[in-house]
A protein has these predicted regions:
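Phosphate/NTP-binding elements of NTP-utilizing enzymes
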Residues: 1-164
C-alpha cells in the first residue's frame, strides 16, 4: 500500500520506521501531519492500538489532522460508527474531535491542553510540540499514555533554541 503515488521518499521512511518512539524534527508544510494521519488510521483499522490521542498547538491544526484522517478513512473504505466533537471534561472545557471505528478503536484530536491526556491510554501524537503553550506539562501528561507499550510520535518545527 505504501508507494510513491501517495508519499514522498522521506514520508515513506517515516512510515517504514516501526520504532515505538519516533521524533520528527521537520520543516513547515512538508506533509508530516498528512503522513502521520495515514499511520494512525491504519493503526486503528488494524487494531494495533485502542486509541490515538493527537494534540497540536491549536484547534485549526487538530481539525486539519482529522480532515486528513477522514480522507484515509474514505480511501480504505473503513466503517466508522461516529465522528464529530465530544466533550472530554466539561469542567475544564476539554473537547476533542473524534473518529470512532466499527472495531471500537478511536482517533481523538485535541487542542494543547495537557489535562486532556490525563488518565488516557493508547498511541500519542504530539504535533508542533515546540509550539504548545506549555510543552513540559503536555509531556508530563502524555508520557504515561504509552506505559503499556503503545507508540509515541513527536513532530515539530523549531521554536528557538532548546525547544525540543
Amino acid at each position: 500500500m505504501m508507494n510513491d503515488k501517495y508519499f514522498l521518499p522521506y514520508q515513506l521512511r517515516w512510515l517504514k520506521d516501526k520504532s515505538k518512539i519516533k521524533i520528527w524534527e521537520k520543516s513547515r508544510r512538508i506533509g508530516a501531519t498528512y503522513v502521520q494521519s495515514f499511520e494512525d488510521v491504519q493503526d486503528c483499522i488494524n487494531k494495533r492500538v485502542p486509541a490515538v490521542w493527537f494534540s497540536s498547538a491549536d484547534e485549526s491544526a487538530a481539525k486539519e489532522y482529522i480532515d486528513y484522517c477522514e480522507q484515509w478513512v474514505k480511501f480504505f473504505h473503513a466503517i466508522v460508527m461516529n465522528w464529530g466533537e465530544v466533550v472530554i471534561d466539561s469542567d475544564k472545557d476539554i473537547k476533542a474531535l473524534v473518529i470512532e471505528f466499527k472495531n471500537g478503536t478511536k482517533i481523538h484530536a485535541l487542542s494543547s491542553n495537557p489535562k486532556g491526556f490525563r488518565s488516557k491510554g493508547g498511541k500519542v501524537v504530539l504535533d508542533e510540540f515546540a509550539f504548545h503553550n506549555n510543552p513540559e506539562e503536555l509531556w508530563k501528561a502524555a508520557r504515561p499514555c504509552i506505559t503499556w507499550g503503545y507508540p509515541l510520535r513527536i513532530l515539530s518545527t523549531h521554536n528557538g533554541q532548546n525547544c525540543l
